[in-house]
């Protein structure tokens, strides 16, 4: 019997502000595709500006999934992301369309593409509560430093603001004696799909300028009011509020910094995050990179995907 044909999936990755959204929609139009967000924060309703969520106008009629599926006070795990996205891939494929995953959350995307197994192990609730208490009393950086001591690779990958994942990595080490990064490393070798993995990059200074400009635009669009709405709803120690763009403005509302300092910190954290994203993708995934410093490469990328996945686009003759 012949080998079972794997589902085709195109994946567009890259750092924040590099131009993934427009490219993905152009590709979806050309390739009869539907888009799955690979961003762990665009899942939250009412968190639109700070997550640079794709707008209805930008979607231009292309279906998007994994956007606005949770309330900000709800938690969300990589295991749930994996399950939901794999279901979307099946359903999109069954409709004769091409699933296109777009985003910047490396671990989440990797968990879908590779044969990751997530245990239902409840872990150690007492230890978890101790770490949560430490994070509240001594700050998230203190707990993140504890992770750096036992699992530096996970600490590099997980931002200090993502307290839930930092504590989960500590908990895995505490209960099993094994690093979270080592557990994942063992599972990374088998792709489950026929994948075309595209990465966008650009000159670092240009990218950083774009990030700074994006933050200014977010403030003009009403980021302060968006975060104030969450703050006034009493949303505090939730996973969603650890996101870059929200934590910094929360510091302002809690009188820890001035608004100017909050915006400056947001720009700094966004640039650092972009750098971490690029490091992750380059170290962890077999990506074909396209430099878009001098402008978009839509036609070139389209030809590459057609060849890699043996597809015909609507632009093909």
Curated annotation (Swiss-Prot):
This is tRNA dimethylallyltransferase. Catalyzes the transfer of a dimethylallyl group onto the adenine at position 37 in tRNAs that read codons beginning with uridine, leading to the formation of N6-(dimethylallyl)adenosine (i(6)A). It comes from the Bacteria. It catalyses: adenosine(37) in tRNA + dimethylallyl diphosphate = N(6)-dimethylallyladenosine(37) in tRNA + diphosphate. Keywords: ATP-binding, Magnesium, Nucleotide-binding, Transferase, tRNA processing. Its EC number is 2.5.1.75. One of its GO terms (molecular function) is tRNA dimethylallyltransferase activity. PANTHER family: TRNA DIMETHYLALLYLTRANSFERASE. Residues 39-42 are annotated as: Interaction with substrate tRNA. It comes from Bacillus cereus (strain ZK / E33L). InterPro entries: Dimethylallyltransferase, IPT, P-loop_NTPase. Its cofactor is Mg(2+). It holds the Pfam family IPPT. GO terms for biological process: tRNA modification. SUPFAM superfamilies: P-loop containing nucleoside triphosphate hydrolases. Belongs to the IPP transferase family. HAMAP family: IPP_trans. The record marks 105, 128 as: Interaction with substrate tRNA. ATP binds at residues 14-21. Substrate binds at residues 16-21.
């Amino acid at each position: 019997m012949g080998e079972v044909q794997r589902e085709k999936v195109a994946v567009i990755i890259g750092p924040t502000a590099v131009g993934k959204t427009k490219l993905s929609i152009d590709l979806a139009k050309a390739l009869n595709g539907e888009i799955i967000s690979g961003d762990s924060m665009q899942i939250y309703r009412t968190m639109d500006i700070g997550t640079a969520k794709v707008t209805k106008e930008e979607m231009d009629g292309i279906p998007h999934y994994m956007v606005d599926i949770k309330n900000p006070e709800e938690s969300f795990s990589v295991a749930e992301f994996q399950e939901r996205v794999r279901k979307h891939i099946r359903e999109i494929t069954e409709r004769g369309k091409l699933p296109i995953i777009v985003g910047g959350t490396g671990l989440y995307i990797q968990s879908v593409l590779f044969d990751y197994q997530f245990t239902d192990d409840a872990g150690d609730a007492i230890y978890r509560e101790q770490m949560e208490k430490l994070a509240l009393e001594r700050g998230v950086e203190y707990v993140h430093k504890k992770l750096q001591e036992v699992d530096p690779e996970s600490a590099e990958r997980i931002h200090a603001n993502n307290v839930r994942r930092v504590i989960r990595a500590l908990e895995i080490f505490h209960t099993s004696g094994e690093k979270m990064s080592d557990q994942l490393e063992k599972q990374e070798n088998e792709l489950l799909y026929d994948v075309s993995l595209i990465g966008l990059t650009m000159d670092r200074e240009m990218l950083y300028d774009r990030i700074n400009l994006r933050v200014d635009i977010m403030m003009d669009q009403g980021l302060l009011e968006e975060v104030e709405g969450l703050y006034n709803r009493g949303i505090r120690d939730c996973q969603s509020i650890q996101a870059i763009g929200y934590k910094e403005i929360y510091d302002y509302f809690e009188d820890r910094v001035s608004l100017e300092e909050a915006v400056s910190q947001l720009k700094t954290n966004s640039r650092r995050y972009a750098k971490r994203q690029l490091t992750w993708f380059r170290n962890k995934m077999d990506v074909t990179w396209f430099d878009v410093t001098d402008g978009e490469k839509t036609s070139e990328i389209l030809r590459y995907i057609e060849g890699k996945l043996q597809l015909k686009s609507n632009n093909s003759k």
